Each structure stands twice: as C-alpha cells, then as structure tokens.
Amino acid sequence: MNRLKQLRIEKGYTQVKMQMLTGIDQSDYSKLENGKRYYTFEQCRKLAIALDTSMDYLVNLTDEKRPYPRSHQKK
C-alpha cells in the first residue's frame, strides 16, 4: 500500500472526502493513489496539508510522517 492511501485510511477519509479537502477530482485522486498518475507540486502540497504530513513523506524522502514544525518553515 502506498503512503498516500495508507495515510488516507489512517485518517478515516474516503476518496470523496479527499476531493473535498484538496480540490483534486476523485477519479484523478484514485489514479494518484494507485500509481497510475504522478502528482504535481501543487497537488502534493494540498495532499500533505489535508493529511497533516510533509511533502517529503509523501514522496518517500523521509520516514517521518509529521509535518515540519512551523518555526522551521519560511514565512
């Protein structure tokens, strides 16, 4: 199971709920989740926010699920 699907299930969200949270069409979201389509930077950002994780976690650059603390983000 990929990280996107794993996080969605952990949160108890449906694909329709993800559409509502991100604005990504449900059919496109399904393709992202099943690896049939790559997400754009903007889609990755929206997904990370909706799932309360970091973009790095979604793209397998880290194993840390939690998003970076706000104090380390640029303003």
Question: What spans do the regions from the language model cover?
Answer:
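DNA major-groove recognition helix of helix-turn-helix
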Residues: E33, Q43, V59-T62
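The alpha-helix within a helix-turn-helix
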Residues: R8, Q19, A48
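DNA major-groove recognition helix of helix-turn-helix/homeodomain DNA-binding modules
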Residues: G23, E42-Y57
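Helix-turn-helix DNA-binding elements, focusing on the entry/boundary residues of the two helices
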Residues: L4, Q15, Q26, F41-C44
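Short alpha-helical DNA-recognition segment
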Residues: G12-N34
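Short, charged recognition helix plus adjacent turn
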Residues: E10, I49, V59-K75
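A short, Lys/Arg-rich alpha-helix, primarily the initiator
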Residues: M1-E10
